[in-house]
């Protein structure tokens, strides 16, 4: 079978012939795994939307109907719900690899990637509201109410988002429409991400530009991607059929129908938002917390500016590598603090220390370590 195509399929040739560094590892597989996750989420989401009812009196029962009465509906629901967790696991590994190996040197590719991450978080949040359980309702109420921290116009924006004076049927309809639309926006951004990647090509673990030591993407790296696909599909099968895993990542409160008159014992988002939620809670001021929440994501956009080292990869930089693993540990600590009871010690103190280190790493340590790295590089070059 001839691999190279003509006409509308001509872009496939760019994938087949893409010059790829020969020394990239399995950490570079997560990009293709994310494409597979996005495809599975869109497919299962479209099938679920055929049976879902975006009405406050029917939403919860329609989800129960999907699980109980629709053929293989329970697989669709749990693959879609837990697939979001797998999606974010792959995203965080992909971002971590980019930070470790200096992928932000491809500035436009990095910016589009951060935008994809932001849209992903928005899509996941509004999707969490759709089952209309207790945590869905109160999570939507608390998180959307944060917009009221904007001076002067915050209250009006919140009412515009809600479509009224509280989270109601209008809110659910809007969130369902956006949750159906945004994945296709993500597809467009992913295509833009790939197009920008093809301009300069992928980076490599050494963090240096090498135009000679490259191989075509097919067949050397498609085989590695296929192996990753098989492993990921195996995980999807397990989370779809194993009862003890299906609901492991689901909040028990969300199996209770939403009741505006009963507040849950704790209100928290899904685990992949907990690090940002902990940063939000660590700032006593409401507006400051909201700004810190958005800054925790948008600070990634500054990485191409903050890191001015000549060799971006941390492979041969033991000091920067040491602090990188500190920020990884800090991410897990923030995730843990986000799930802890609000306003209780020592969680408040730990959360504030972890928040300071989170921003300190990006805004202080990264520029400082880059400057020191350049000094050592120039010193070794002159001796």
UniProtKB/Swiss-Prot annotation:
Its cofactor is heme b. The lineage of its organism: Eukaryota, Metazoa, Placozoa, Uniplacotomia, Trichoplacea. The chain crosses the membrane at residues 30-50, 74-96, 109-129, 175-195, 221-241, 289-309, 320-340, 345-365. Belongs to the cytochrome b family. InterPro entries: Cyt_b/b6_C, Cyt_b/b6_C_sf, Cyt_b/b6_N, Cytb/b6-like_sf, Cytochrome_b, Cytochrome_b_C_euk/bac, Cytochrome_b_N_euk/bac, Di-haem_cyt_TM. One of its GO terms (cellular component) is respiratory chain complex III. It is a multi-pass membrane protein. The gene is mt:Cyt-b. It comes from Trichoplax adhaerens (Trichoplax reptans). Heme b b562 binds at residues 80, 179. Heme b b566 binds at residues 94, 193. This is Cytochrome b. Binds 2 heme b groups non-covalently. It holds the Pfam family Cytochrom_B_C. The main subunits of complex b-c1 are: cytochrome b, cytochrome c1 and the Rieske protein. GO terms for molecular function: metal ion binding; ubiquinol-cytochrome-c reductase activity. It comes from the Eukaryota.
């Amino acid at each position: 079978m001839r691999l190279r195509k003509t006409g509308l399929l001509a872009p496939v040739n760019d994938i087949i012939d893409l010059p790829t560094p020969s020394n990239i590892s399995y950490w570079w597989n997560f990009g293709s795994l994310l494409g597979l996750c996005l495809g599975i989420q869109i497919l299962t989401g479209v099938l679920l939307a055929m049976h879902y009812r975006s009405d406050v009196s029917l939403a919860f029962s329609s989800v129960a109907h999907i699980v109980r009465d629709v053929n293989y509906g329970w697989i669709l629901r749990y693959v879609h719900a837990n697939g979001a967790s797998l999606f974010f696991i792959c995203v965080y590994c992909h971002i971590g690899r980019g930070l470790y190996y200096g992928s932000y040197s491809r500035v436009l590719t990095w910016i589009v990637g951060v935008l994809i991450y932001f849209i992903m978080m928005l899509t996941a949040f509004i999707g969490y509201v759709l089952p209309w359980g207790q945590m869905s309702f109160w999570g939507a109420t608390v998180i959307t109410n944060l917009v009221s921290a904007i001076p002067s116009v915050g209250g009006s924006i919140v009412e515009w988002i809600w479509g009224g004076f509280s989270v109601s049927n209008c809110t659910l309809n809007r969130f369902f429409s956006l949750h159906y639309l945004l994945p296709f926006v993500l597809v467009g951004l992913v295509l833009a991400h790939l197009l920008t990647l093809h301009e300069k090509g992928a980076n490599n673990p050494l963090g240096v530009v090498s135009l000679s030591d490259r191989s075509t993407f097919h067949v050397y790296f498609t085989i590695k991607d296929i192996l990753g696909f098989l492993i990921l599909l195996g995980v999807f099968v397990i989370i779809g059929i194993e009862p003890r895993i299906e609901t492991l990542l689901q909040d028990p409160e969300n199996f209770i129908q939403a009741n505006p008159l009963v507040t849950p014992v704790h209100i928290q988002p899904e685990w992949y938002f907990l690090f940002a939620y902990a940063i939000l809670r660590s700032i006593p001021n409401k507006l400051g917390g909201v700004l810190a929440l958005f800054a925790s994501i948008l600070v990634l956009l500054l990485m191409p500016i903050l890191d001015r080292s000549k060799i971006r990869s941390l492979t041969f930089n033991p000091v920067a590598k040491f602090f990188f693993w500190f920020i990884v540990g800090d991410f897990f600590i923030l995730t843990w603090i986000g799930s802890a009871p609000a306003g209780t010690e020592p969680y408040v103190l730990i959360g504030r220390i972890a928040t300071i280190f989170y921003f300190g790493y990006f805004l202080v340590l990264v520029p400082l370590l880059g400057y020191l790295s350049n000094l050592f590089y120039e010193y070794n070059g002159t001796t």
